[in-house]
């Protein structure tokens, strides 16, 4: 058996799958090693994809050549368009996955992809050698391969670690704890020790998941039914479906009695007893944490979501907890519709090792070990979408590393992927990181619906998307700009414009003749309305949507573009790699420590390091002007 590979990906969750596919699609012989082949792309918690910021990540992965977007479009129970009454920066799609079909079909995709070998084993050791750095006479460590629990050595030029919650994973339910990376699945106990021995800093986080209920024991007559869209906005531009699934979800609420039971049983909560003493995701708190933090809140939303059309398991979104089994049962009896519900799987917390991402370059390669990339929860993130985005970038850059090409770096003005990676490297967070629109300074530019436009140059740089699709996207982009220019040059008389508005029951009126673009700026006027009125060209929906948005929000987009120009200037003020921050007088100790840890490549990057102030930046620039 040939055990030599270009790239080895460790872990086959959402990060590992995207990394392996990206590497293989770029022509590299790739091994994907996982503890369990049957749980590839497993949705360990909520069986859904998308949400604020997260949907943006998925569309970005998709246009660059990743898999998640088209996969959730195909294997979902429902898709829901959210925030449709809000501005374009807030509009998104959320998909409820058929988790078993999603998982099975992703494995099939991997098995049918050329250059990928699937291997079930546990990686226990990272193998390296010392080589002389070409830029100086120092020695650096370089990847040579991995060693598994079975004693097998696999050789590789590059390794991507995408280990999820399995590094020294420990499950907690009440006062019970045991080693596992996921309930019923063993943990990887030795790999993080190997990383420590290589000088990589390791810390601990935790996350948790709610109980799963037996659908047959739920009284749905007491619940509010919520259906998806028959014709949603899909995650992928290349998805063509006549009609989407509309399997419902259901809404209920906790009651006064629920809060009373939780307060009464709070002493059994692992976060109170000390059984869990690491940080969990702030934006997905357990129900006991919610009651602790918001003791006066009378009720909390609970969404009941099917996990698959071929399963009776119901995911209880909003009831995450690791309280003892008997307490979980007590809580259910206080919730409308769930009084007689039977638990199929109890909620639990899982603690695990991760490696703070300040140790990485923006390519996601480790700074100490050449050829070692990290992606997903091992970098301190939560969420399938965050994992997939990192996995894709790590897989692409692993391939670029082997070819001796420059890594693909996406900055925070170009994509939510850039925001995610930039924040991970520069901003310390006390809990697993989640992408949010509030973290993105340029939200209007980084819309869910325009990834194909803002990332077009990166699509070509990555090199996965085929020529026909690139030509299709290029034509679509040209159509957008051509039609915007056309609308700005079409003159419409005052009388004709006002008759048109009257026909749409719009009260607004013009006092003089206008350009067609001014008519489209009116809130309730769509491109389709204008198309009929002025006999305009017809385009695909995603093109028409861009024409509308770019005209209606033109002033705001221009303002944001000016801010991006200022950002880019700082990004191109490069800091020498060998700069000695100890020589710069006046910098705070906190800033000096952060700068030494991250070693920013530009002034722009330095501004985003935790603890670095504007005064510190001024001193660095002054030092560079004098000394360098």
Swiss-Prot record:
Membrane-crossing segments per the record: none
A Pfam short name: SAM_GIDA_C
Keywords, alphabetical: Cytoplasm, FAD, Flavoprotein, NAD, tRNA processing
One GO process term, biological-process aspect: tRNA wobble uridine modification
GO MF annotation, one: flavin adenine dinucleotide binding
Residues annotated as binding NAD(+): 280-294
Subcellular location: Cytoplasm
A GO cellular component entry from the record: cytosol
Classification via PROSITE patterns: GIDA_1, GIDA_2
Cofactor dependency: FAD
UniProt xrefs under SMART domains: GIDA_assoc_3
Flavoprotein found in the keyword field: yes
The name this protein goes by in its record: tRNA uridine 5-carboxymethylaminomethyl modification enzyme MnmG 1
């Amino acid at each position: 058996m040939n055990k030599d590979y270009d790239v080895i990906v460790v872990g086959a969750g959402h990060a590992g799958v995207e990394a392996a596919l990206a590497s293989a699609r770029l022509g590299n012989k790739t091994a994907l090693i996982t503890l369990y082949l049957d749980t590839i792309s497993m949705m360990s918690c909520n069986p859904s994809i998308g949400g604020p910021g997260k949907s943006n990540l998925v569309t970005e992965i998709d246009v660059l050549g990743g898999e998640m977007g088209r996969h959730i479009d195909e294997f979902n129970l429902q898709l829901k368009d959210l925030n449709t009454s809000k501005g374009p920066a807030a509009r998104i799609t959320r998909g409820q996955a058929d988790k078993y079909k999603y998982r099975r079909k992703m494995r099939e995709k991997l098995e049918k992809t050329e250059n990928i070998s699937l291997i079930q084993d546990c990686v226990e050791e990272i193998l390296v050698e010392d080589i002389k750095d070409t830029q100086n006479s120092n020695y650096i460590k370089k990847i040579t391969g991995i060693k598994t629990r079975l004693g097998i050595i696999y050789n590789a030029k590059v390794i991507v670690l995408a280990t999820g919650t399995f590094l020294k994973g420990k499950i907690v339910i009440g006062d019970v704890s045991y080693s596992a990376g996921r309930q019923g699945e063993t943990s990887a106990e030795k790999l993080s020790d190997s990383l420590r021995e290589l000088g990589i800093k390791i810390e601990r986080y935790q996350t948790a998941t709610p109980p799963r209920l037996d659908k047959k024991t739920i009284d749905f007559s007491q619940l509010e039914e919520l259906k998806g869209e028959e014709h949603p906005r899909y995650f992928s531009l290349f998805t063509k479906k006549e009609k989407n699934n509309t399997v419902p979800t259901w809404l209920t609420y906790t009651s006064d009695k629920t809060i009373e039971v939780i307060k009464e049983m709070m002493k059994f909560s692992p976060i109170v007893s000390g059984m869990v003493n690491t940080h969990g995701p702030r934006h997905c708190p357990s129900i006991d944490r919610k009651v602790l933090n918001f003791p006066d809140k009378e009720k909390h939303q609970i969404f009941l979501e099917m996990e698959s059309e071929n399963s009776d398991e119901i995911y209880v979104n909003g009831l995450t907890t690791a309280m003892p089994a008997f307490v979980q049962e007590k809580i259910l009896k206080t919730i409308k519709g769930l009084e007689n519900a039977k638990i199929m799987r109890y909620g639990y917390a899982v603690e695990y090792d991760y490696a703070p991402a300040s140790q990485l370059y923006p390519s996601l390669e480790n700074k100490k070990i050449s050829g070692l990339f990290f992606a997903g929860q091992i970098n301190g993130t939560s969420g399938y979408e965050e994992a997939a985005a990192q996995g894709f970038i790590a897989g692409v850059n692993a391939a670029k590393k082997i070819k001796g090409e420059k890594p693909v770096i996406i900055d925070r003005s170009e994509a939510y992927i850039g925001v995610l990676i930039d924040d991970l490297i520069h901003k310390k967070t006390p809990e697993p990181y989640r992408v949010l629109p509030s973290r993105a300074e340029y939200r209007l530019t980084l819309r869910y619906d325009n990834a194909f436009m803002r990332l077009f140059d990166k699509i070509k740089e990555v090199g996965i998307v085929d020529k026909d699709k690139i030509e299709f996207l290029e034509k679509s982009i040209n159509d957008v700009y051509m039609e915007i220019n056309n609308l700005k040059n079409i003159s419409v008389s005052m009388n004709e414009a006002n008759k048109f508005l009257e026909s749409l029951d719009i009260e607004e009126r013009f006092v003089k003749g206008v350009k067609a673009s001014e008519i489209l700026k009116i809130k309730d006027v769509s491109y389709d309305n204008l198309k009929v009125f002025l006999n305009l060209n017809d385009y695909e929906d995603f093109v028409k949507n861009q024409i509308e948005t770019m005209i209606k929000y033109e002033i705001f987009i221009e303002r944001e573009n000016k801010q991006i120009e200022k950002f880019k200037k700082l990004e191109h003020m490069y800091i020498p790699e060998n700069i000695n921050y100890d020589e710069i007088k006046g910098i705070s100790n906190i800033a000096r420590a952060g700068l030494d840890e991250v070693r920013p490549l530009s002034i722009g990057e330095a501004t985003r390091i935790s603890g670095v102030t504007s005064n510190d930046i001024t001193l660095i620039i002054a030092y560079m002007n004098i000394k360098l």
